[in-house]
Amino acid sequence: MKDSIPFVSPKTMEASFVLPHHGEIRGMAVFAGITLIVGGGYHGKSTLLSALQMGVYDHIAGDGREFVLADETAVKLRAEEGRSIRNTDISLFINDLPNGKDTKNFSTPDASGSTSQAAGVVEGIEAGSRLFLIDEDTSATNFMVRDDFMQQVISREKEPITPFLERARDLYEKAGVSTILVAGSSGAF
C-alpha cells in the first residue's frame, strides 16, 4: 500500500506483544474502561473507530488488519432515527416522557435519535457486549451529553434524558462494559 500513512501510537498507549508466528509487534493498546479519542476534522478518529469495529473479525495476513483486534463482543452504537423499538427498558437513560409513555417497557415504530441510541445501549448489554464503540458524528447529541448552558435553561428535574456520559462509568464499574468514544466538536466529553 504505497500511499498509506503508518499509524503511530501515542507513547502513553504504546504496547508490545509477542505473536507465535510473527515475533514482537508494537502498537496501541486500549485497555478496559472509558477511552476518549479526540481530534480535529479529518484527523482519522472515525477511521480508527472503524478499524476497531472490524477488529472483531479475523483477517488474512498481509495488509496489517490482522493486527487490529477488539473484544469479540464489541458493538458500534449510533442513533437510528426512525427505527422500531419493541418492549425495551430504556429507563436507565429516559424517563417521564411528555406523552406518559412507559420507558420500562418502551415501544415505538418510529424512534427518535436519543430513544434509538438508548435502546441500542440496552440491547448491547442484553446481548453481552463488553465494549461499546461510539462516534460523536453518528450519535444523538442530546443522548450523549448536556452542557452547562442547557442545564441552566432546563433543570435536571424537567429533562427526561440522562446523558450516556453520566452513565458510562457505572456501565463500566457495575456492568463491565467499556466505552471507546471518538469526538471532535464538543469539549463536554
Task: Give residue spans per PLM region.
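N-terminal pre-Walker A segment at the start of P-loop NTPase domains
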Residues: 2-26, 61, 69-74, 78-85, ...
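Conserved P-loop NTPase nucleotide-binding/switch module
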Residues: 125-168, 172-175, 186-188
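Flexible beta-alpha connector loops of hexameric P-loop NTPases
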Residues: 83, 91-114, 146-161
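Short, ordered loop/turn segments at secondary-structure junctions
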Residues: 42-43, 80-82, 136-139, 184-187
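Conserved H-loop
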Residues: 178-181
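Glycine-rich phosphate-binding P-loop
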Residues: 25-54
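Phosphate-binding/switch loop-helix module in NTP-utilizing enzymes
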Residues: 104-139
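Post-Walker A helix-loop "phosphate-sensing" segment adjacent to the P-loop in P-loop NTPases
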Residues: 54-65
